Swiss-Prot record:
NCBIfam families: argP, PRK03635.1, PRK13348.1
PROSITE patterns per the UniProt record, alphabetical: HTH_LYSR (PS50931)
GO MF: DNA binding; DNA-binding transcription factor activity
GO biological process: regulation of DNA-templated transcription
Pfam families named in the record: HTH_1, LysR_substrate
Similarity comment: family membership: Belongs to the LysR transcriptional regulatory family.
Organism: Yersinia pestis
Residue span(s) of domain HTH lysR-type: 4-60
Superkingdom of the source species: Bacteria
Subunit structure: Homodimer.
PANTHER family referenced in this protein's UniProt entry, alphabetically: HTH-TYPE TRANSCRIPTIONAL REGULATOR ARGP, TRANSCRIPTIONAL REGULATOR
Key words, A-Z: DNA-binding, Transcription, Transcription regulation
General function of this protein: Controls the transcription of genes involved in arginine and lysine metabolism.
The protein's name in its UniProt record: HTH-type transcriptional regulator ArgP
């Protein structure tokens, strides 16, 4: 059985995390040549490339498996050794989360964990349709995803759903929808998407108004909080989680443009198995809080 030296695995991990050999060398306090040598040792051991040497570098499929192994070992070492290993540096937990969860329920859910445990969070924001891929690649140890099926050697639990409403300011509605929300009016109403792969707005309009994808003008803004600001100032109409705009809806600052119509996205918590003690506490915190504030019934659509 091929057993990698974990020092060489840490070099591979540093190159991926730091997005290059030079910064990885600085992080590890060794020379860039030493980083290259350690990775070459790994590649010789396994007889195949572990890095695609692009800018930034990315792991091959075998590299992804080794990174996942490293992260599991680090968590299990923490469980067995605890604070007896003489290292005062808080444990780094890399998690892949969607922007809307981060803007609404995730941080309150993690509050007791952050208060009780010596950990450092590395929250990597990604669309909920793609967070599981970061777990597959070994970039993170846990992911909030819409995928219900676990990856091999992983665990999954249902967290609950976010309900998305199609909202805008009253002034925006009066300007663009004076006769109600119609297909022709929607074609002229500015909207917003998180990135070019975010299809929630388009999917909602296609499902409920038979509008083809790409037919509605969309701003691209990589911020969940900015969606709320854009809607409040009357710039766009957009899909926003109900949980994020309860006060604005109650005050009338924002209005639901299509009462009775919504998008429900069920979220699931994925992580490696077996769980370390720390990850078990993270899981318990996320499941407990998520089940308090997220919808638990079956989702309506994606």
């Amino acid at each position: 059985m091929k057993r990698p030296d974990y020092r060489t695995l840490q070099a591979l991990d540093a190159v991926i995390r730091e997005r290059g050999f030079e910064r990885a060398a600085q992080k590890l306090c060794i020379t860039q040549s030493a980083v290259s040598q350690r990775i070459k040792q790994l590649e010789n051991l396994f007889g195949q490339p572990l890095l695609v040497r692009t800018v930034p570098p990315r792991p091959t499929e075998q590299g992804q498996k080794l990174l996942a192994l490293l992260h599991q070992v680090e968590l299990l070492e923490e469980e067995w050794l605890g604070n007896d290993n003489g290292v005062d540096t808080p444990l780094l937990l890399s998690l892949a989360v969607n922007a809307d969860s981060l803007a609404t329920w995730l941080l309150p859910a993690l509050k007791p964990v952050l208060a009780d445990l010596p950990i450092r969070l590395n929250l990597q924001v990604e669309d909920e349709t793609r967070t599981q891929e970061r777990l597959r690649r070994g970039e993170v140890v846990g992911a909030v995803s819409i995928q219900p099926q676990p990856l091999p050697s992983c665990l999954v639990d249902q967290l609950g759903a976010l309900d998305y409403l199609f909202v805008a300011s009253k002034a925006f509605a009066e300007r663009y929808f004076p006769n109600g929300v119609t297909r022709s009016a929607l074609l002229k109403a500015p909207a917003v998407a998180f990135d070019h792969l975010d299809d929630m707005h388009q999917a909602f309009l296609q499902q409920n108004f038979d509008l083809s994808p790409g037919s509605v003008p969309c701003h691209i803004v990589n911020s969940s909080e900015a969606f709320v600001q854009l809607a409040r100032q009357g710039t766009t109409c957009c899909m926003i989680p109900h949980l994020q705009i309860e006060k604005e809806l109650a005050s009338g600052e924002l209005i639901d443009l299509t009462p009775g119509l919504l998008q429900r996205r069920m979220l699931f918590w994925h992580r490696f198995a077996p769980e370390s003690r720390t990850m078990r506490k993270v899981t318990d915190a996320l499941l407990s809080y998520g089940r308090q504030v997220l919808r638990q019934d079956s989702f309506i659509g994606q």
